[in-house]
Amino acid sequence: APEGLQPEYRFDKTTLKSGKEYYKPVPGVKSTFTVTSKEGKKVMITTLTREQGQNLVKLDNRVLITKATVLPEEGRCTLLSMGENKIDYILYPSKHGWKQQTIEVEEVQPIMEWKKVGSRRMVVHVEQPDYPQVHEYFLNIHYTGDVAMAFMNGYLELDHFYYGAPWTIGLKRFRSQLEKYDMNFYIRPLRKDAPYLNDLPAHAIPDFNKKGENCVFRKVEVVPEYKAIL
């Protein structure tokens, strides 16, 4: 149901064998009602919230509602969850009906160290141990600057233009390299006359009167993307 709108259903009573002519349900998994046509066909109607509808995936003749990323496979599916080892879902129809279920996998503590080298550079050492419940590790870099660049073994691997959000890097593709080398990062200072400043959200614009605020690594973290089989 769209936000701000109250869903309503109205049926032609001449076509009903049982059920009401008019329904005004509250969106959610408890909103189910049933009507039966004169031909004896029973129809169950559930009105989901907007968020539930956006998180819905159709699997064969069932629906799956989850915030996790869904990878369908034959006879099963894989759920991917960024940073959360508990994955909530609703699978319907099933023996649980519309009741929410939870899959929990063992939590993992990523292995990572980072240190600043001057005001514009830093070095990150990260390990990617194999765990059956981890699909991939992601490096999140919270920084302020104009452009950030990532190097390994002297070569530029990636760059990122600042827009106020963390720089997220999937590490699986660098697995073999990270076993040999650390990642080196460099950021170029953000200038107060940069033409795109007006396009940035207010919280992303630094205080240029404070030294170093326009060129700084603020926080670095490694987040595991958990996986579970449903």
What does each of the following model-derived ranges do?
Residues 1-230:
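Non-catalytic C-terminal accessory domains or segments of carbohydrate-active enzymes
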